[in-house]
Amino acid sequence: MGGYILAIDQGTTSTRSMVFDRDMRVIGVGQREFPQHFPASGWVEHDAEDIWKSVLETIRLALADAGIAASDIAAIGITNQRETTVLWDRNTGEAVHRAVVWQDRRAAPVCEDLKRRGLEPLFSKKTGLLLDPYFSGTKLKWLLDSVSGLREKAVKGEICFGTVDSFLIYRLTGGRRHVTDATNASRTLIYNIEDNAWDDELLSILNIPRAMLPEVLDCAADFGVTDKALLGAEIPILGVAGDQQAAVIGNACFEPGMMKSTYGTGCFALLNTGTDRVASTNRLLTTIAYRLDGVTTYALEGSIFIAGAAVQWLRDELGFISVASEVSALAEKADPKQRVYLVPAFTGLGAPYWDAEARGAIFGLTRGTGPAEFARAALESVAYQTFDLLDAMRKDWAGDNGKTVLRVDGGMVASDWTMQRLADILAAPVDRPVFLETTILGAAWLAASRAGIWPDRKAFADHWRRDRRFSPDMEESERKNAIAGWRDSVGRCLSKRDN
C-alpha cells in the first residue's frame, strides 16, 4: 500500500474525487454531475443510486488520472452535502425513498407545529439549531409519517437513517458499518451537541426510532474498510466531515476567532469559537466545527441557501449567460448609477432571517435595466447576505475585535470582481487561498493525519497559502447606503413583515 490519500467530496449537484500524494499535491481528479428532482413546489430530491454511482465513477476516474491502483491508497476521507436525508434497507442497502435534499422545504408545517407548541427553545438549547425544514430531523419525521409502512419497519430496525456520508460508508463497507461523524450528526436536529449523543427527548418529540440511527464517531476515526469487491482493495476510511466543517479544516481555521465562508450552491460562514459553545442571540446556529481526539470544537454558523445557485438561475432560467464563468464579465458592464437588488429567496431565506415562506424578488428596475444589471445584482446578493452573517457574528462573538479577516473558498471565489465587491460590502479583508478546493482538502487531511501520513494541525496550518488579499475600497457612505437598500429589499420579501 502506498502513501496516497483518496478524498471524496459528495456535493449537491456533483461528486468529485481527488488523489493526493504525501506532499499534499493533487495528482488525480474525477468529477461527475448528477440530476436533481423537483417533484413539487419547494421539494428537492436526489436519487441515492445516482449519488452512489457518481462516487464509484469519480473514484475510478481519479485513480486512472493519477495512474495508480486502489491498493496504493492508504486512506479515504469523505466530505458531503449536509442535512440531506437518506433512508435505506438495512439488509439490502437499497434506498427506500429518494434522498430529501437540504434545500427541501416540505417539512415547514412540521416546524411550524413544533414552534406553536413552544418547543423551539428546547431544540435550540440541545442542538444549537433552529426549527427549520433545512435540518434532517423534521425531514425524517415527514418521511416516517408520510411513507406507508416505513415507520413500522424503522421500529423493527429494518431501516437505516443517515446523512449522505453515512449512506456512502454503508455502501463502501459492504453494509458492515452504519456510522457517521460528529459534524454531520450535529446537523440533524436530534443530536445533543453538549452531551455529544443522540437525544432521547427530541427523538420522542419527533417520534423517531433510535434503532435507525448511526453510531457517531470523531471526524478522524476508524469508519471501516472498503469492500474489496468494489475497488479491488480494502482501504480504511479514516476521515469524515460535513462539507462546511471540512472547509473550516481545509482553511486551517483552527484558532478561536478564525472565520471561513464557502461559496458554492449556497454560502456558509463559520466562526471558530473554540471549546466554548456560544449561544447566538442573533439567529445564527451553534454547531460542531470538528471533534478530534474526543475534544469538541464549536462554531457559530450562518447559512445562506442561494449563492452560486443565483448564477445558475441567470444561466438556466433567464438565459443571460451560457456558462457560469461569464457572469463576472457581464456584471462589470452594469450601469454603476443603477442600484438593482436581487433577493434570491428562491427556497426561503436562511440566517439570520430563517423565513421558509419568503420568496425572491428584484427591486430597482428601470427601462435601462438589462442582463448586466441582473448579473451584478446576483453577485452582490452574495456579498449582502454575507454581510448579514458577519454582522450577526460580531454581535454574538465576544472575542470579535473588529479586525476579522475572512478566508474564502468554493467556485465563486475565483472571480476577482466578486471578491472585491465582497470586501467592499463587508468593510473587511477577504483572503483567497492558493488551493481553492479547501473542502476536499479538509477531508483529505482528516484521513491522512489519522493515517500518520500528513502533519499535525499546526504544521498543516503553516502550509496554508494565500493567493490574494482583497481589501475594502468603497466609501463608507456609499457602503451604508447600499446596505440600507439591501435591508429594505429583504424586508419587503419576508412573509411576516411590518406594514
UniProtKB/Swiss-Prot annotation:
Q: Which GO terms describe its cellular component?
A: cytosol
GO molecular function (one): ATP binding
Q: Which residues bind ADP?
A: 12, 16, 265, 308, 411
Specify which residues bind sn-glycerol 3-phosphate according to the UniProt entry for this protein: 12, 82-83, 134, 243
The processes (GO biological process) annotated in the record are: glycerol catabolic process; glycerol metabolic process; glycerol-3-phosphate metabolic process
In terms of InterPro entries, this protein maps to: ATPase_NBD, Carb_kinase_FGGY, Carb_kinase_FGGY_CS, FGGY_C, FGGY_N, Glycerol_kin
Q: Which positions bind ATP?
A: 12-14, 265, 308, 312, 411
Transferase as a keyword of this entry, yes or no, is yes
Q: Which UniProt keywords are listed?
A: ATP-binding, Glycerol metabolism, Kinase, Nucleotide-binding, Transferase
Record-linked CDD domains: FGGY_EcGK_like (cd07786)
Catalysed reactions, as listed in the record: glycerol + ATP = sn-glycerol 3-phosphate + ADP + H(+)
Q: Does the keyword Phosphoprotein apply?
A: no
Q: Which residues does the record give as glycerol binding sites?
A: 82-83, 134, 243-244
Q: What class of enzyme is it?
A: transferase
- Report which superkingdom the organism of origin falls in: Bacteria
Q: Quick one: signal sequence residues?
A: none
Q: Write the Enzyme Commission number(s) for this entry.
A: 2.7.1.30
How's its activity regulated?
Inhibited by fructose 1,6-bisphosphate (FBP).
User: Annotated pathway, please?
Assistant: Polyol metabolism; glycerol degradation via glycerol kinase pathway; sn-glycerol 3-phosphate from glycerol: step 1/1
* Role this protein plays: Key enzyme in the regulation of glycerol uptake and metabolism. Catalyzes the phosphorylation of glycerol to yield sn-glycerol 3-phosphate.
Matching entries from NCBIfam families are given as: glycerol_kin, PRK00047.1
Name the family the entry cites. Answer: Belongs to the FGGY kinase family.
Q: What name is this protein filed under?
A: Glycerol kinase
